Structures are given as C-alpha cells and as structure tokens.
Amino acid sequence: MVRPRKLFAQHWLKSEKALDAIVKAAECSTNDRILEIGPGTGILTRRLLPAVQSLVAVEIDRDLCELLAKQLGKKENFLLLQGDFLTIDLAANLGSFPKFQKPNKVVANIPYNITGPIIEKLLGTISNPNLEPFDSIVLLIQKEVAERLYAKSGSRTFGALSVRVQYLADCEFICDVPASAFHPPPKVDSAVVRLRPRQIEIPVNDPKRLENLVKLGFGAKRKMLRNNLQSVVDRDRLSQLLEQLNINPQARAEDISTQQWVKLANLLGVE
C-alpha cells in the first residue's frame, strides 16, 4: 500500500458518506467524459468509472501511478496520465486517445495547497476565460476556501477570489466533510463544492481593468473602497459612481457584488 506523502499534500478520503455526496453532485451519465485530478489510490475513481463514458486521471505521484495502472489499467474507459496537472498539456496528451478527448466534467479531491491555481486552470481568468468550459466542476477542497467561492457580498468571507470565480461560474455548496473523513486527517475541515461555468450576465468591457480594480479594491479589505481605488479614480468621482450604482459611498470591497464590480469597471471605462 502506498503511504500518503507530505510532499504532495496527500490525504486519502475514506468516508463513504463523502464519496456518495461527491458522486451524486457530479450527476454522471454514460455520456460524460470525466477529468479527475489527483486520483490517489483510486477510491473515487472506482465509484465513477461504471457510470461514465470515460475517465482520464492526472496523477503526479509515480508510485500511485504504478498502483492505479496495476489495479485499473485494464478498464477500457480509464486513462491515466502521469504528471503535474498545473503544467501538463491535457489536449496534447489526449490527442492520440479520441475516446478521452475534451472531458466535459471535472470531479476531484484536489491538493489544498494548490487549490487556487487548479481552479484558475479549469475556469481561466476574467481576462482569459476557458473558451471550452466544462459542464460542471465538483471539487473537495478546504472548507475555508470553499466558503470564499460561494460567499455573498456583504459577508466576511467575500473577497477577490469570490469575484474572480463568480464572474465565470455559479458556485454551489454541497456538503461539509470533517477532517476525520481522511487518512491521515488534515489540520482543517473540508467541503464539497460544485462550479458551473456559465455565460457572463453582464460582460465587462475591459477585463484587465476589472481584474485590476478587484485586486486594488481588496488590497486593504477593511478600508473603504474609495480609499483603496484612489490610485485609479478620484475619491469624489468614485463616490458619485457608487451612488449611481446605488452603492453606499462608504462601502468596502466586500460589500459590492460581482455584478456591481463589473458595472463599476464599465463606468470607469467611459470616463
């Protein structure tokens, strides 16, 4: 049996309840082509394989790849790629495997220390969104990060990550997963979330401007927005724009919804 390695922040999920919740949230059908990131020992993989058309798993750990190849390698709808998901060229690696090309769903228990970069690779960014979005992305991640993904404006957890992700996808909380559901147990609790990439309701005219505004706006979270953004717009002018959007001029960054951030960026674009 391969032991979890700290180098790769590995924690094996062992809870049947959590596994059931993940599989249910994925809403798999026999037409689905699944991408799994970090399959580990394959406990989730085994649940998914009978229900889907194909599953491609990307695993960085060579020892785990040997284990998975030995146990699941003969499954016709299973393909294993050894490598770092953040750097691997998925399309190029799948070029010779038509059955596994263009996965339409992601289901994964991902390493918590690289959650942000993984989500960015899956969704893209405000200025460079994924042009071939997945139908859905179901992730088991650190609870604190999960709360930021689906946070509403006005809450203490709403931040720059919330805006960047919610601009590109609908975010839904599925369930909490305690540390005891893993071996070894991590130092934090976890949660399952589902992201559904969608059409942008209010397109931003200048994506780079929006990214810059969000970065500056949340730079000093407890300060009023007109103070954080004074390097790009006069305080009095910003107060006028906020009032035009029915936003309190004394608002802080976390008080403004994703759509309001977009509207503000668009107004500044016609200055």
Curated annotation (Swiss-Prot):
It comes from Nostoc sp. (strain PCC 7120 / SAG 25.82 / UTEX 2576). The lineage of its organism: Bacteria, Bacillati, Cyanobacteriota, Cyanophyceae, Nostocales. It catalyses: adenosine(1518)/adenosine(1519) in 16S rRNA + 4 S-adenosyl-L-methionine = N(6)-dimethyladenosine(1518)/N(6)-dimethyladenosine(1519) in 16S rRNA + 4 S-adenosyl-L-homocysteine + 4 H(+). Pfam families: RrnaAD (PF00398). Its EC number is 2.1.1.182. Keywords: Cytoplasm, Methyltransferase, RNA-binding, rRNA processing, S-adenosyl-L-methionine, Transferase. S-adenosyl-L-methionine binds at residues 11, 13, 38, 59, 84, 109. This is Ribosomal RNA small subunit methyltransferase A. Specifically dimethylates two adjacent adenosines (A1518 and A1519) in the loop of a conserved hairpin near the 3'-end of 16S rRNA in the 30S particle. May play a critical role in biogenesis of 30S subunits. It is found in: Cytoplasm. GO terms for molecular function: 16S rRNA (adenine(1518)-N(6)/adenine(1519)-N(6))-dimethyltransferase activity; RNA binding. GO terms for cellular component: cytosol. Belongs to the class I-like SAM-binding methyltransferase superfamily. rRNA adenine N(6)-methyltransferase family. RsmA subfamily. PROSITE patterns: RRNA_A_DIMETH, SAM_RNA_A_N6_MT. The keyword Transferase applies. It is an enzyme of class 2 (transferase). It comes from the Bacteria. Gene3D superfamilies: Ribosomal RNA adenine dimethylase-like, domain 2, Vaccinia Virus protein VP39. InterPro entries: KsgA/Erm, rRNA_Ade_diMease-like_C, rRNA_Ade_Mease_Trfase_CS, rRNA_Ade_methylase_Trfase_N, rRNA_adenine_dimethylase, SAM-dependent_MTases_sf. The keyword Cytoplasm applies.
